[in-house]
Amino acid sequence: FRGYLYTDLLKRYKEVIIYDEDLDNIKKDMPVSSEADGWNFVYNDLKYAGEHLPVDKTPNGRLTSGAAYAMLSRAMLYAERWDDARIAAEKVMGMGYELEAKEDYSNAFKAGSKEAILQYCYDKSSTVTHDFDGYMVPGGDKALDGNSMTGGFGTPTQEMVESYEYA
């Protein structure tokens, strides 16, 4: 989503140049927009996506209305627009997403989980690969073939490891 990327820009820079037309027509002298205008742009962009994307999560991994409204809610928290964040969150909560039962905790990580609002799904039989697992190994560990430089970003702390029961 364009609104998702602009959320990241606004979090970092507060003021951004808003490109809302065909990239072939971009002018080099575009003015910097105010932070308020930037958040209005994000709001309108993600609200439009929420209104026009399908609610149904099948096929797995497809962007949905729920994903757009979840992103909108989070963006409006950063913008300190509390009512807009609440309204978007209520839309997501009304779409059938649920937390997985404690007894079925592992289901939260499976494709099609009722807990997943936006989920990457991979098929072992396809040729589509990823290096996400490289983020979960200690830095410098050669978990992947080639020159992956991803190690360590998602490595859990010892405190987190100890919070789980041992098998």
What are these regions (language model features)?
Residues 1-63, 79-84, 88, 94-95:
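Aromatic-anchored glycine-rich loop motif in surface-exposed flexible loops
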Residues 39, 43, 47-50, 62-167:
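An aromatic- and glycine-enriched ligand-binding surface/loop that stacks and positions planar moieties
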